[in-house]
Amino acid sequence: MDSKDHRNELNRFFKSFVHAGRGIWETARTERNFQFHAAAACAVLICGFLVELSIIEWMIIFLLIGGMFSLELLNTAIEHTVDLITDKHHPLAKAAKDAAAGAVCVFAVISCIIGLLIFLPKL
């Protein structure tokens, strides 16, 4: 691989981060549920500092926050893809959107339970 090919690969690699950032920003700007989860994450982080979480607890919290944001992004991508494919109400389109929303809901509930297990003993 010559120097020019290496630069092109590196350029494409960095551009992928730009595209990812745009996707995150657009979702954060337009999706109400993502905004709710961002506010909840801020509240959890503040509470974590106040109760002085251990390093393991911080790791768990960051995994849960990252997982929640990731699932919200995937849910949004699925919703947009379904909307692009059809503007008609179709049972399969509804099933795809509902399943994606269900995945977010399951992770949110489990995250809340784990959060309670971490925070309640510290109160």
Swiss-Prot record:
Keywords: ATP-binding, Cell membrane, Kinase, Lipid biosynthesis, Lipid metabolism, Membrane, Nucleotide-binding, Phospholipid biosynthesis, Phospholipid metabolism, Sporulation, Transferase, Transmembrane, Transmembrane helix. Disruption phenotype: Cells lacking this gene exhibit an abnormal cortex structure in mutant endospores 6 hours after the onset of sporulation, an indication of cortex degeneration. In addition, they display a significant decrease in the dipicolinic acid content of mutant spores. The chain crosses the membrane at residues 34-51, 58-74, 100-120. Induction: Mainly expressed during the vegetative phase of growth. One of its GO terms (biological process) is sporulation resulting in formation of a cellular spore. It is found in: Cell membrane. It is a multi-pass membrane protein. One of its GO terms (molecular function) is lipid kinase activity. Coiled coil: none annotated. Its EC number is 2.7.1.66. It catalyses: di-trans,octa-cis-undecaprenol + ATP = di-trans,octa-cis-undecaprenyl phosphate + ADP + H(+). Residues 52-57, 121-123 are extracellular. It comes from the Bacteria. GO terms for cellular component: plasma membrane. Residues 1-33, 75-99 are cytoplasmic. InterPro entries: DAGK, DAGK_sf, UDPK. Belongs to the bacterial diacylglycerol kinase family. Catalyzes the phosphorylation of undecaprenol in vitro, which is probably the physiological substrate. Exhibits no detectable activity against other substrates such as monoacylglycerol, ceramide, or diacylglycerol (DAG). Appears indispensable for the maintenance of spore stability and viability in B.subtilis. PANTHER family: DIACYLGLYCEROL KINASE. This is Undecaprenol kinase. It comes from Bacillus subtilis (strain 168). The lineage of its organism: Bacteria, Bacillati, Bacillota, Bacilli, Bacillales.
